[in-house]
């Protein structure tokens, strides 16, 4: 049986989507014996895998130069590229990729479904010119620049929303090497068992039997979202909200799913709005794939931000028999609430009014100090109580300590105890990653596990039992 390996190192997400493989590559000496290698999505560049694993670059190059077949997906394309500009907000900050594909990547934020049109033929796109394939993109650094004739553009995506604005853009998303047997896609979801590109890959390996092809997805299937025997059942929903954007919702969500999963619960995760990058840390922790129902639609005037309506999302969660669905809010609790109506919602608080949900509210002391964070928590808790959504836990993130600050926290804790709300504090962690930029998923997982195991899990299970 042909050996198709998939890279499984820090920052790699081999289970993010259906991909064909039957071997995990996680140590030196494994690549040379493969027939094909998949470089999966994730945060391979941000996780500095070429530096962390000294053998990796050398062994991939040796494999490529011996005629090995390589497929890179999203972060895998960045890994194979010549350079990546990781600075999305200021001056260029280029880091080197492996250089197998003579391309560079620049910041381009895309987080939604796309159609990619095949425009040129390579071994991967043979027989597909002028056809369209449906998938999705979820990246921060996705603008491909071809640097010389060694690389061919095989496909172009038509994007209707990018860089947080609604506008149309056509951009290269499928590329192949004219020099090596290397193909890259920035589009997810086009390498499943029924994909014509996958069939071309299997043809290259001399595999034509559909039953054998299905065998290469067994490891992927092991982490699929499968319905439980007692499904459908209504999951308990926990919504993670913050007083402002950037206060730690994504990290807290990751810690929650780690805790609940560790306790033996079947737990899913979803995001209000369309920025599905915020789901990646939780999916990395769970080692499960992204699905469209995880992006819950908000209405913004006549535009939809997100993929599916909340009823469809919850129906999918119930159909799986999930015990818990953890939903990360969008920006601050009240952001967009002036657009809410009885029929549709544009905000986190609007979602809470529509859906029966437990609430965990977080505020960060990094912006205006412990005092400011407590003031915001107090104000927003009052607002939530008024709509019948009293938080089960309030989280003071990025806590720092001083005599007066600690006394203020003690007073606030007593105040919340009178409301049967638990106050949890999280000291500032040495983590530089951000969900939308420069995120090392391994770094995020370590921080989430630390929060979960040191304090959150014990408090969470107790609070859920009381509410």
What are these regions (language model features)?
Residues 161-206:
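A glycine-centered loop/beta-turn motif at secondary-structure junctions
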């Amino acid at each position: 049986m042909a050996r198709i390996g998939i890279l499984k190192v820090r920052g790699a997400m081999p289970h993010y989507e259906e991909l064909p493989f039957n071997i995990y590559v996680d140590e030196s000496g494994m690549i040379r014996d493969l027939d094909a290698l998949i470089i999966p999505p994730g945060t391979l560049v941000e996780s500095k895998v070429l530096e962390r694993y000294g053998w990796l670059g050398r062994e991939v190059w040796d494999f490529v130069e011996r005629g090995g077949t390589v497929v890179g997906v999203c972060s895998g394309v960045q890994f194979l590229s010549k350079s990546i500009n990781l600075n999305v907000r200021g001056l260029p900050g280029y880091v080197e990729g492996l250089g197998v594909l003579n391309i560079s990547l620049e910041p381009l934020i895309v987080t939604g479904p796309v159609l990619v049109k095949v425009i040129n033929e390579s071994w991967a796109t043979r027989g597909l010119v002028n056809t369209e394939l449906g998938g999705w993109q979820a990246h921060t650094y996705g603008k491909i620049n071809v640097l010389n004739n060694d690389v061919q553009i095989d496909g172009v995506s038509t994007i209707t929303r990018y860089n947080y604005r609604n506008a149309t853009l056509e951009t290269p998303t499928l590329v192949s090497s004219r020099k090596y047997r290397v193909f890259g896609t920035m589009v997810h979801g086009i390498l499943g068992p029924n994909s014509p590109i996958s069939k071309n890959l299997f043809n290259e390996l001399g595999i034509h039997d559909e039953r054998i092809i299905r065998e290469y997805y067994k490891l992927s299937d092991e982490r699929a979202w499968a319905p439980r025997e007692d499904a459908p059942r209504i999951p308990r929903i926990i919504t993670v909200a913050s007083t402002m954007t950037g206060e730690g919702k994504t990290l807290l969500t990751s810690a929650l799913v780690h805790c609940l999963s560790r306790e033996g619960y079947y737990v899913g995760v979803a995001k209000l709005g369309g920025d599905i990058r915020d789901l990646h840390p939780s999916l990395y922790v769970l080692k499960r794939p992204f699905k469209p129902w995880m992006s819950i639609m908000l209405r913004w005037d006549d535009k939809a931000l997100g993929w599916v309506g909340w009823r469809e999302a919850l129906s999918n969660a119930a159909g799986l028999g999930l015990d818990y669905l953890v939903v990360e809010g969008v920006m601050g609790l009240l952001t967009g609430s002036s657009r809410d109506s009885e029929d549709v919602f544009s905000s986190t608080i609007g979602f809470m009014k529509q859906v029966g949900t437990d609430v965990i509210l977080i505020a960060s002391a990094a912006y205006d100090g412990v005092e400011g964070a407590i003031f915001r928590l107090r104000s927003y808790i009052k607002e939530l109580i008024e709509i019948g959504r009293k938080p089960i836990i309030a989280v003071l993130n990025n806590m720092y300590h001083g005599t007066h600050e600690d006394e203020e926290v003690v007073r606030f804790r007593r105040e919340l105890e009178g409301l049967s709300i638990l106050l949890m504090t999280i000291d500032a962690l040495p983590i530089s990653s951000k969900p939308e930029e420069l995120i090392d998923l391994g770094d995020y997982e370590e921080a989430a596990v630390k929060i979960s195991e040191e304090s959150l899990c014990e408090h969470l299970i107790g609070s859920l039992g009381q509410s």
